[in-house]
Curated annotation (Swiss-Prot):
Keywords: G-protein coupled receptor, Glycoprotein, Membrane, Receptor, Sensory transduction, Taste, Transducer, Transmembrane, Transmembrane helix
Misc remark: Most taste cells may be activated by a limited number of bitter compounds; individual taste cells can discriminate among bitter stimuli.
GO CC annotation, single: plasma membrane
Task performed by this protein: Receptor that may play a role in the perception of bitterness and is gustducin-linked. May play a role in sensing the chemical composition of the gastrointestinal content. The activity of this receptor may stimulate alpha gustducin, mediate PLC-beta-2 activation and lead to the gating of TRPM5.
Name the record gives this protein: Taste receptor type 2 member 60
Keyword Hydrolase: no
GO molecular function, one term: G protein-coupled receptor activity
Signal peptide bounds: none
Membrane topology: Multi-pass membrane protein
InterPro entries: TAS2R (IPR007960)
Source lineage: Eukaryota, Metazoa, Chordata, Craniata, Vertebrata
CDD domains reported in the protein's UniProt record: 7tm_TAS2R41-like
Family designation: Belongs to the G-protein coupled receptor T2R family.
Length: 318
């Protein structure tokens, strides 16, 4: 089953697990609030100016997918916690998994395209292909967004087919969730259909993301070394700008890596579902998810300006 480790079968009664689930829900609320602010801030600018820069349009798309994804995941967490013995392919969880599969794939692709955009626009490479992409990439943005939605929809349908077939097999054979025959059929489908599909779906955008991030961080590192030779140190405004950009990129990369690892660990069954280690790992992942929107708010000049205007309006200053 896809989506926040939806294989069930044991109840969560441990007090530590309950505390971690509570922390997890709070972190998700923070992530929802942060992404919601990003959507609202850039959405207002879009309405006022009737346009958005390509980078901002990608940020809105990423923020919207994360906002919806966190909301769906929160619903799944509550459902799993309240119904730990529910069959993992019942209609409710299939509906939630359908949303999760689409939003998860869209989030991965939007994050990847944002890294591509940063790499092409910021990195200082002189290769002809790289320079050609600098001029063409912004015009491709609508097609990039549509292709991301299309790929996400296609893989979501493939996931739904596998999930629905297992549920139909369960109904035909009147199997119980803990039935040995039912579990063997489910394990076969998960191992030879869902798992390869997951790896292909998640690895493609991740590979592109890593390549772009390595190129971009390498370019910024070289530029910082050159700047150090011509400036008085790290207190120079230009150097501080490079450091902030590098830290923002590293935080983005850490979030993406941690999220990708959580997906792989889930698919491989490294952390048993509803086990204490499972909730610890989830808390770490969503701590990153909650922190990254905050980093974006302070690293993006437009978002930072909106945040300052909100503070000044609260204080009653012009």
């Amino acid at each position: 089953m896809n989506g926040d480790h939806m294989v069930l079968g044991s109840s969560v009664t441990d007090k530590k697990a309950i505390i971690l689930v509570t922390i997890l829900l709070l972190l998700r609320l923070v992530a929802i609030a942060g992404n919601g602010f990003i959507i609202a801030a850039l959405g207002v600018e879009w309405v006022l100016r009737r346009m958005l820069l390509p980078c901002d349009x990608l940020l809105v798309s990423l923020g919207a997918s994360r906002f919806c994804l966190q909301s769906v995941v929160m619903g799944k967490t509550i459902y799993v916690f309240l119904h730990p013995m529910a069959f993992p392919y019942n209609p409710v969880l299939q509906f939630l998994a359908f949303q999760w599969d689409f939003l998860n794939a869209a989030t991965l692709w939007f994050s990847t395209w944002l890294s591509v955009f940063y790499c092409v626009k910021i990195a200082a490479f002189t290769h002809p292909v790289f320079l050609w992409l600098k001029h063409k990439l912004s015009g491709w943005l609508p097609w990039i967004l549509f292709s991301s939605v299309g790929l996400s929809s296609f893989t979501t349908i493939l996931f739904f087919i596998g999930n629905h077939r297992m549920y139909q097999n369960y109904l035909r054979n009147h199997l119980q969730p803990w039935n040995i025959t039912g579990n063997s059929i489910r394990s076969y489908c998960e191992k030879f259909y869902l798992f390869p599909l997951k790896m292909i779906t998640w690895t493609m955008p991740t590979a592109v993301f890593f390549i772009c991030m390595i190129l971009l961080i390498t370019s910024l590192g070289r530029h910082m070394k050159k700047a150090l030779l011509t400036t008085s140190g790290f207190r120079e405004p230009s150097m501080q700008a490079h450091i902030k950009a590098l830290l923002a990129l590293l935080s983005f990369a850490m979030l993406f890596i941690s999220y990708f690892l959580s997906l792989v660990f889930s698919a491989a069954g490294i952390f048993p579902p509803l086990d204490f280690k499972f909730w610890v790992w989830e808390s770490v992942i969503y701590l990153c998810a909650a922190v990254h929107p905050i980093i974006l708010l302070f690293s993006n000049c437009r978002l930072r300006a909106v945040l300052k205007s909100c503070r000044s309006s609260r204080c009653g200053t012009p």
